[in-house]
Amino acid sequence: LSAGYGSMLSDWTLLLLLTPLLNGSLVVRVSLKKTLSEVLMLSKRQRSLIEEAVALEFEDAKASGATGYLPHFLAQATLPHKDPKCMYFERGTSNLTLSILAHPKYGMPYGMMPRLLLAWMCTEACRTSSPELSLGRNQNEFLKKLQLPSDGRYIKALHAQTVALIRSQLSVEVSKTGVLAFESIQIAKNGFVFWNPNKPDEECLWNSNLTLGSDFYDAITKAPVPLKMEALQALRQSPLAMDIYTWLVYRMFTLNVAARSGRNKEAKIPWVGLKCQFGGGYEETPQGVRSFKANFLKQLRGVLLYYPDARNYIEETPEHFVLKAGARPVVQQRVVAGR
């Protein structure tokens, strides 16, 4: 496998994503070529090194004070930034695609709220080791769990986006030449939401609760990306900034894993690739790439306030965004943006 970002996925990431496949829980179509042995038949030593490096990096970050977690596939492929006004949406890299099929009654989840919701779900599932999540007795109680103000904007968005998210269907697809692996993921198996949006502080007799789908629970608790929830909260005015933060944390995490397992220590990401991964609403032209790049770098300045050590491990070139291994886990960082 190519270790460069031309392939958009590192070896260990592909292994992590394909682990359910190797265990027989993913559907797969395979062209029986050399690619199969390259992608799926890593030597036991290679797998051992990668898995050990993942575990070490994860434990380092966990011990350093992670306050939140996010599924690795949601750090690579993102939700819509704005209402796409459609029932189907997909985004991703050349190797990984996240697609979302919205419930026709509730619409597509978009913006900052479902990003915070997904991070909270993952964090709670990791913290409690349970797929059963309590949302509280009213909306205000749940807003406090998300550390959001209990004003009209958030109350309305919370109700609409929570229902849109938990009633949507996710699909994650990983592809390489000759290999396709995919899995459909149900976010919530069942749930009871008793909120009255007109009376957000009115307590109900019962807790609102969700039971995560087994596939989603497994996906979000298997080697999730450690992060700081405080950073996501602070960056919530820009869904793109939230996406850049989680992606940067994830990519630095994977580079450190790669370095620990004796593999690649640098990733060169083409700007055109980042535009496909993050940028909706930009023209498919050189000017569209330049516009995306300018906005990405603008949002990155705010992101680096919450991951200052990463400054020393990133470079910008006309054609690429370059990341290098060595940045400390984000959870070890001292936030310098307390404003």
Task: Name what the model sees in each region.
Residues 2-7:
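Extreme N-terminal basic, low-complexity initiation segments
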Residues 9-339:
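Charged, alpha-helix-forming regions
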